[in-house]
């Protein structure tokens, strides 16, 4: 079987490589010619431990090659971004564009699968698009929705071992698509329909967002009450039926920070708690930025000079290079905009350069800083010795003080 993966980003490329590793002939497609070029050279354009070696293996074996245009295949997977537009309205234009690209290639017996996080009903809408353009294919191809559920930084393991939800447009589609994923997924494959599978993905990430909002709300309360929130949560979690997550500087990434809007946009009256959680997590970044600005003002009033500030971390979570929807990046931007010529050192050990920020090595920034702001709990920061001689704003629990 030959499979065509539309999109070679943080999910599409690893999934394509894993499938190729298990013997599937893969055509990986991306409209970014530079991504295609470096991928075919065996270089990974994302950070994912162990994945570059695997990419070189599947290129050498002939099971994988990247292209800028879709190739004739037996299965087509839409793994493209689904951002939001306007007032947090879901934008499925990339899914539609990728679908239109493969439309001329579809033939009887082919699989068409959406992995991109999508609003409920997207698979049905794409099926209608396909059949309106290619009516001869109705009832003759297999269409399903199968959401990814992996953690960046642990993708190789999770793509293989995590359970997957397979939501077909009909039972035959579900069975056929389960057969494909069964070639490389060791986790259990759970059959359902496409709308339930779409809602399942949105529910998983919205659930995480609500739980993080509770932790972030505790951080507001503890800050005002003079309580160490990290100690509080650790003690509360000693209860056998309590499992509070860790607070942070907000919620980022292209899943948890985005997916709840796919629910609230379509079901606004029925999703008030989900909406409030989004507001809480968005507010946390503004709260953190204000804390930094206040610390800078106190320093200047006390010392009579501008402080040197180390902003530690830009990624949306630890130990990755993904800055999408990152609250740390937003906080850093706000601090830079109001720094009044203070020395702001921006640190991100997983990124070599950035078009907006001048990056400083983390040890250098930590040693020079008058104020240290921990935004992301990268593994490199764990090896630093706590400094009692400067103000440390720890928004991610690096030292839990």
Task: Please give the residue ranges for each predicted region.
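Structural/interface elements that position substrates and couple domains in central-metabolism enzymes
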Residues: 1-401
